[in-house]
């Protein structure tokens, strides 16, 4: 069992990430209410690093210590990740990458855009 079975391409993963980065807006149309996106990114009562199906990059407990605390991500089976970084206006899609390698990968991308 793979948790529900959302099977989409990397391009569609990126579109989901861009939609979240844009707070629900796509090409001038509100697809998802901005309030819902804000709720998705609000920590739940059980964990300060989890919202509605989105992981939050809390400075102390987040997966990406070198990334802004405003970053958030979705992670699925096989460490398929949609990483969204509002501070840098960045969406990263990575698929079938070792989970422990992902923080270094994100840090390399962030370093490349800082220079």
Task: Enumerate the predicted regions with their spans.
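Catalytic pocket-lining loop regions of alpha/beta-barrel enzymes
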Residues: 2, 17-20, 30, 34-47
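Non-transmembrane alpha-helical segments in soluble domains
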Residues: 14-21, 37-41, 55, 70, ...
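Active-site Gly/Thr loop motif
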Residues: 38-91
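Structured C-terminal helix/loop/strand segments within mature extracytoplasmic catalytic/sensor domains
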Residues: 74-115
